[in-house]
Structure formats: C-alpha cells, structure tokens
Amino acid sequence: MSSSRTIIRGGLVITASDELHADILIEDGRVAALAAAGTSAAEAWTAERTIDATGKYVIPGGVDAHTHMELPFGGTFASDTFETGTRAAAWGGTTTIVDFAVQSVGHTLREGLDAWHAKAEGNCAIDYGFHMIVSDVHQETLKEMDLLVQEGVTSFKQFMAYPGVFYSDDGQILRAMQRSADNGGLIMMHAENGIAIDVLVEQALARGETDPRYHGEVRKALLEAEATHRAIKLAQVAGAPLYVVHVSAMEAVAELARARDEGLPVFGETCPQYLFLSTDNLAEPDFEGSKYVCSTPLRPREHQAKLWQGLRTDDLQVVSTDHCPFCFVGQKELGRGDFSKIPNGLPGVENRMDLLHQAVVDGHISRRRWIEIACANPARMFGMYPKKGTIAPGADADIVIYDPNAVQVVSADTHHMNVDYSAYEGKHVTGRVETVLSRGELVITEREYTGHAGHGTYTPRSTCQYLN
C-alpha cells in the first residue's frame, strides 16, 4: 500500500561503514531500498510522503544501551519516566534504548523483569529492550539467567560497587560469568572496588569532608582500574566475554587495552560526561557540584584525552549515557552536608548524539566513527544489528535527518528531559536533529514532536554479535 511508503531524498547517508549520497525508500516500517540520488531507479519510486534531506545527514537512529528510567536509588527515583525519557531520547536522535531491570535481593530475576515491563509497556515513544541487573546470585538465579537469554534478555549487569545494595562478591561474579559463558549472555560490569571506597567515604566524612567534590576524591581512579583488572581476570577464568560500563579513568582504559591486546573478548563503554565534563564541575560552589555526582565519578580533565584515544583505537567501542536523572531541587539536595547521600546519576539521553557530533567537528572522531560508537556498535554488542544501528535493506526504518550546520545552545530551558538542570548548560553545539523516524513513523517532524506514548515496542535481543 502506498500509504506506508516514505522516500527520503537528497541527503548524505552516513553509516558505520559508508558515506554516500543516496535516496532511501521505506516500506512498512523498514528500509526497502537505497539508490544513488538522481538515478533512474531512485526516480522511479513513488510514495505518499517524501522528505527532502538536501544538505543534511541521513543517519541511523541512535542506540543508547545504558539508561535508567524510573530507577529507585538512595530513597528516591530517577526523574524521567519511560514516557518522558523516551520522548527526550527521540528529540536527541536516539530511537532505541536498552534500560536496566533490577533484581532486588531476595527476589527473582523474573519479578524484576516483570516490574520493568509494567513500567515501560504502552509508555515509550521509541523501541526499548532490557538488560537485567543481577544482585542476588544463587542457584535459582543462575537457572533463570538461561531462561532470560532464551527470551531476548541477553545481558546481565553486576556491581563491584554499592555494598548492601547491588554488590556482588568475586565468587558470585565468577558463578554468573561461568553461566554466561555457557548460555551466550554478556556480563556487564560496574567496576569499582566498593568495599574499599566505603572505607574512604567513612574516613572523609569523619574529617568533615562533606562537599560534592569529595565524591570524586574517594572513588579513586586506582580503585576503578583495580576492579576492571579483577573483572577481566575473573572473566578469563570463566571463559566469558566482559563488557565494562561507564569507563571514566585512563588507568581503567589501560587495563582494557592490555586485555584486548591479549585477544580477550573484553569491551568497554564510556559516556559523554567523562568526555566533556571533569572534577572541575564537581567542585562548583554552593552545592552546584552535586549536579555532577555519578558513579564512576567525573575525573580530572587529563583523563579525557585518553578516553578519546580509546575510542579511536577501539579499546572503547560504545558511548552510552548512563542516563539517570535526579532533580537538583529535592533530590540532589538529599546529600547536603553528606556527599554520600547525593543520588548518583546525570541526565544525558537527549544530548549524546549532538555531543558526539560536536566531537566530529572538534576533530576527535570521524563521522563514520560517530555512527559506529553511537548506533552500530551498541546494536551489535547487544544483539540488535542490523535491525537497529544501520541503514540497509531490511533494517528497521529508524532514521534521523540531521542538520550538521545548525548551532544550538544546550539548556534546561529547552531540553525535554524531566529534570531541572542540564549537565551541559550553556554549551554551544554544532549540529541538531531535525526529523526522526522510528520504524518509518515520524516521531520528530522538523523540530516538532509528532510521536506518541505506546509507539515504542519491546525489542527482544539475540546474543552479543561481536562474539559470533
């Protein structure tokens, strides 16, 4: 039926592997064909809707493989719901998120997963999948991991941090890694030595060091590196692949690089906050620094160059946001007088694609690498490629028309995330999302929201495609 056909004409199509001036035919929510602009094949297409992308980039929708909508943390909840968070993601050119369902201690994986399905179903503007946070490893949990992999939840997050909440000890981590080595799942690790960090927190507070900047000082880069090294060795013993989340320290990048040089299936993710922000932000006066409290913490500025280098050399493969927003008023303020009570997390799901385009403008990465780390690699890593993460016949028509020349100023006044501040307030960025399609449906139309809650569907995933 012609009513479900769309043509995008005249744009520069950029994927992880190619840049070409091509027209795109979309049919029934999928990419049906690409043809060089101006050719007879492209000219022969007809459709009800034609989008003019002349002078623009045509890129795959972003895949943000690390978000926390409605996450309970520190006595409060992340301020974005699945409805507000996925709408904001669409505004930022992201068309798929993978969020984290949480197993609470004493409960089953299934109970946690069901709870997250209930939060998301019917509320999302874009497609979504789930990872599973495993906080209580025992024989029943391990059996459940096999079942979850079979139904498309193919990655499991463990924490070496947060004793008493999400923490797993080395024995629990090893057991889960052994299980994932057998069932094809991928262990995602929050690599920080939480036991040692808790000692440093206690000592800092006893000295009266209560301001937000001490959050960064106690969560030492060496303790991120140590935990990264330990996670790599445990994975090696288990014969399992490993994905280290939110890498922030150059010493941790060095551990990943060493493991990869040895040929181990070890992967790393970093986030825009570590590439663009630093401990200078944590030290902002009048408790403003609390806006930048996240874990792993922001590092001194000299770490940024090593993170960019890791992205260029493929020692880091993915940039996700770890989007976990808490309002300054009433939420971040819970930690006034005690930095350890500041809810950990930053808003960013709307900013990632633009910040990484700015990195292209600044010469840190190429255009294709931008698409690779923001779209293709996360889709491959988490079993969604080539349905997601690229523009090719058969792929979902998750497509962004991107204006590479528009200049914008990032601000809480104009963003769509449900949070009262921007981590990048006042930053000038070159490049802006103009139009977004999710499975061929217009979600953002020339800078206007035309999507709706419930369009986004749950996306089961296959196992990590880097290992196949």
Show the residue positions of the predicted features.
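Alpha-helix-loop-beta-strand connector modules within alpha/beta enzyme cores
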Residues: 110-126, 174-189
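His/Asp/Glu-enriched, well-ordered alpha-helical/loop segment
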Residues: 210-239, 313, 317-319, 325-406
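Short catalytic-loop micro-motif centered on adjacent basic/acidic residues
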Residues: 98-99, 129-132, 241-246
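Histidine-rich, glycine-flanked metal-binding segment
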Residues: 1-60
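Histidine/acidic residue-rich metal-binding segments in metalloenzymes
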Residues: 140-319, 335
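Metal-associated gating/positioning segment near the N- to mid-region
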Residues: 53-123, 140
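C-terminal cap of metal-dependent C-N hydrolases
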Residues: 11, 333-338, 393-459
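Divalent metal-coordination and catalytic microenvironments
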Residues: 11, 24, 29, 55, ...
